[in-house]
Each structure stands twice: as structure tokens, then as C-alpha cells.
């Protein structure tokens, strides 16, 4: 029986082992026509079919601080101010606003997904996470904080 335990363990748990592939297939996830709420003025924001760099973050996320600076620079230096959207994910709205007051506002769209519906539909694992949306479809996911190499890839490969 001792010799069969490792085999039994593999049979039971092997199907649950998967890897995360950030390159999506032709079955890309569509996210158009979602409504979010602005963190700035509480107005409705519609996620449409345009090009969007959609970043999920939270005020308690230490990696999100550095990434926030990168996204501000990306938006301001590459004329993408209407294309970068930071979505506060499973966080207290007041804490999110305090984060922005502490670390600055950029030429970025700041939103909250109050019901987490968009995050659930698009398969968010956690924060930070960034999705590249082209024509209403997520075509690339960056799980974890963005780095300069990721930023360069975004600038060179997407509209």
C-alpha cells in the first residue's frame, strides 16, 4: 500500500495542476459593454471596443505603487491618456482614493468595478494584473507587476 500512495496522490491531484499562459488564443475574452464607475467623479464609464490598457490594482498592493508610476509615464509619454484605465479591484473606495492622493494622479482613467463583474468575466487572478484590450477582446494578459520590458512590448505591438 505504501508504494501505491504516491501514484494515488498523482492521479487525484495532477488534473488540478495547471500553468498560467498569458498569451491568449483565438478564443479571446470579449469585455465590451461593461459599465464601471469613476473613482474621480462617480460617473459611469463604459468599457467599449477601443484599445485599452486595463490594469487591476489595489491600495494595499505594494507592487502596484511602482506599477502606477510606470502607467502614468506610459500614458503621458506615448499619447495614451485615454487608453490607460486603472481599475480598483476588491478594495475600499476611500482607500483607493487615498492611494491616488498619496502617489499621484496621471492622465489615466481611474475606475472601480464595484461588483467585480468585469474582473470575473475577464479572469483576473489578483493584483496587479494588466490586460491589453483590442477591439473589445483581451489579447494579452500580464499577471504580476509590469516592467520596462512589458511597457516596451505594449508600445511596439499594440495600437
What residues fall within each predicted segment?
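N-terminal "domain-start" segment that seeds a small globular fold
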Residues: 18-45
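Hydrophobic beta-strand anchors of alpha/beta hydrolase catalytic cores
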Residues: 53-54, 84, 130
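Short, conserved active-site loop motifs that form the nucleotide-linked donor/cofactor pocket
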Residues: 82, 108-109
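Hydrophobic h-region of N-terminal signal peptides that target proteins for export
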Residues: 11-18
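Structural microenvironment flanking redox-active thiols in thiol-disulfide oxidoreductases
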Residues: 66-103, 114-120
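Sec-dependent signal peptide recognition
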Residues: 2-10
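Thiol/disulfide oxidoreductase modules built on the thioredoxin-like
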Residues: 102-106, 113-156
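Short active-site neighborhood of thiol/selenol oxidoreductases, capturing the structured segment around
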Residues: 44-65
Amino acid at each position: 500500500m505504501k508504494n501505491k500512495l504516491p501514484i494515488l496522490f498523482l492521479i487525484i491531484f495532477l488534473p488540478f495542476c495547471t500553468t498560467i499562459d498569458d498569451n491568449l488564443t483565438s478564443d479571446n475574452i470579449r469585455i465590451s459593454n461593461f459599465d464601471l464607475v469613476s473613482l474621480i467623479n462617480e460617473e459611469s464609464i463604459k468599457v467599449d471596443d477601443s484599445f485599452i490598457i486595463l490594469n487591476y490594482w489595489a491600495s494595499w498592493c505594494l507592487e502596484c505603487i511602482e506599477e502606477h508610476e510606470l502607467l502614468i509615464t506610459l500614458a503621458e509619454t506615448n499619447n495614451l491618456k485615454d487608453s490607460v484605465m486603472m481599475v480598483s479591484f476588491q478594495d475600499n473606495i476611500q482607500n483607493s482614493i487615498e492611494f491616488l492622493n498619496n502617489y499621484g494622479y496621471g492622465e489615466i482613467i481611474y475606475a472601480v468595478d464595484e461588483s467585480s463583474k468585469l474582473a470575473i468575466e475577464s479572469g483576473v487572478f489578483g493584483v496587479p494584473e494588466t490586460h491589453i484590450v483590442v477591439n473589445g477582446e483581451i489579447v494579452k494578459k500580464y499577471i504580476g507587476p509590469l516592467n520596462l520590458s512589458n511597457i516596451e512590448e505594449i508600445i511596439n505591438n499594440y495600437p
